[in-house]
């Protein structure tokens, strides 16, 4: 279920304050955040935001196709360990 249009998109207040205080167009500026539930807004395009995935901050470069999605969608929390190809015990 999506958020009501009358409420507007959710973005954490501390993240919005960081975005307003920093020049986001500079490539060396990385904004760290723990707010995975914040929605990507059009004024964030071109910024690099390091989103916490539970272990480390994953840098995410915001492009115009990402507008409307959540920051957590681009920072995976789980790593896939591939299945063992030659497991002789499993063949029995």
UniProtKB/Swiss-Prot annotation:
Protein origin, superkingdom: Eukaryota
UniProt cross-references to InterPro entries, sorted A to Z: Ribosomal_uS19 (IPR002222), Ribosomal_uS19_bac-type (IPR005732), Ribosomal_uS19_CS (IPR020934), Ribosomal_uS19_SF (IPR023575)
Entry keyword set: Chloroplast, Plastid, Ribonucleoprotein, Ribosomal protein, RNA-binding, rRNA-binding
One MF annotation (Gene Ontology) recorded for this entry: rRNA binding
Cross-referenced Pfam families: Ribosomal_S19
The keyword Transmembrane belongs to this UniProt entry's keyword annotation: no
Recorded GO CC terms: chloroplast; mitochondrial small ribosomal subunit
Keyword DNA damage in record: no
Predominant localisation class: plastid
Any single biological process term in GO: ribosomal small subunit assembly
Location(s), subcellular: Plastid, Chloroplast
Record family assignment: Belongs to the universal ribosomal protein uS19 family.
HAMAP family to which the protein is assigned, alphabetical: Ribosomal_uS19
Summary of the function given for this chain in its UniProt record: Protein S19 forms a complex with S13 that binds strongly to the 16S ribosomal RNA.
Protein name: Small ribosomal subunit protein uS19c
């Amino acid at each position: 279920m999506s958020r009501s249009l009358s409420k507007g998109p959710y973005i954490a207040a501390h993240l919005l304050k960081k975005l307003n205080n920093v020049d986001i167009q500079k490539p060396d500026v990385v904004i760290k955040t723990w707010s995975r539930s914040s929605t990507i807004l059009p004024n964030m395009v071109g910024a690099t935001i390091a989103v916490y995935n539970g272990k480390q901050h994953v840098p995410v470069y915001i492009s115009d196709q990402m507008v409307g999605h959540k920051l957590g969608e681009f920072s995976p929390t789980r790593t896939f360990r591939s299945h063992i190809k030659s497991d002789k015990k499993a063949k029995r």
